[in-house]
């Protein structure tokens, strides 16, 4: 069934494909020195480009999973907000928390935000699968936090997997989800005293 957010996923697919096919990774990646010189747009564009085709394929597969299984749980605007907030949180985190990172590329951090947001939204419609997916994602993030990238993932991506970006992206997804839930929770707590 068609959902307006499919346009968003298609745009991400096409843009990331073209940037890799045209070998524009170096022009669009997060580049700390260029950002310091005023190219602030690189704070967002770095999330669209990928290092190599296998990295792109992994990210697009993740995007397809979000599209086919989770996208109907939120509107185009909500998904776009998750993408922008997750990308912003990742870029801020890389900028302030990881000052030794000079370059960053990849959609995987934003994907973690999309997945966690989608899983939390899924708990409203399909509680069992929503809670299972949320638990699996938190387990994966916990593993990565303490142990680094999953075995074999750096071979598939062609470089270092910045697991901190996965965690930061997930935080971005949670921020959007909480921003949507808090008004409802406050209303229930303070206005529905039945």
Q: Positions of the model-derived regions?
A:
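C-terminal transmembrane module of polytopic alpha-helical membrane proteins
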Residues: 1-4, 10-14, 48, 144-194
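Membrane-interface helix-boundary motifs at transmembrane edges
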Residues: 1-3, 68-78, 121-129, 186
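Alpha-helical transmembrane segments of integral membrane proteins
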Residues: 3-10, 78-82, 128-135, 164-167
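N-terminal TM1-TM2 helical hairpin plus the immediately adjacent luminal interfacial "cap"
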Residues: 9-85, 91-104, 156-163
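Alpha-helical transmembrane segments of multipass membrane proteins
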Residues: 17, 68, 91-96, 114, ...
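Hydrophobic alpha-helical transmembrane segments of multipass integral membrane proteins
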Residues: 17, 63, 88, 134-145, ...
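Alpha-helical transmembrane segments that form the membrane-embedded catalytic/substrate-binding core
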Residues: 54-63, 105-116, 158-180
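Multi-pass alpha-helical transmembrane bundles in non-GPCR membrane proteins
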Residues: 100, 106-149
């Amino acid at each position: 069934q068609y959902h307006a957010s499919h346009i968003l996923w298609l745009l991400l697919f096409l843009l990331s494909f073209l940037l890799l096919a045209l070998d524009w990774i170096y022009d669009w990646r997060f580049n700390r020195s260029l950002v310091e010189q005023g190219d602030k747009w690189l704070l967002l564009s770095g999330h669209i480009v990928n290092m190599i085709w296998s990295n792109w394929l992994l990210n697009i597969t993740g995007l397809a999973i979000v599209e086919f299984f989770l996208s109907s749980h939120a509107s185009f605007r909500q998904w776009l907000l998750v993408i922008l907030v997750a990308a912003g949180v990742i870029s801020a985190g890389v900028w302030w928390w990881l000052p030794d990172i000079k370059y960053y590329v990849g959609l995987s951090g934003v994907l973690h935000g999309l997945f966690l947001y989608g899983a939390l939204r899924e708990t409203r419609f399909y509680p069992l699968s929503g809670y299972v997916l949320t638990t699996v994602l938190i387990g994966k993030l916990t593993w990565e936090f303490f142990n680094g990238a999953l075995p074999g993932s750096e071979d598939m991506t062609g470089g270092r997997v910045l697991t901190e970006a996965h965690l930061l992206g997930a935080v971005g997804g949670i921020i959007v989800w909480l921003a949507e839930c808090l008004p409802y929770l406050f209303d229930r707590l303070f206005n529905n005293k039945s």
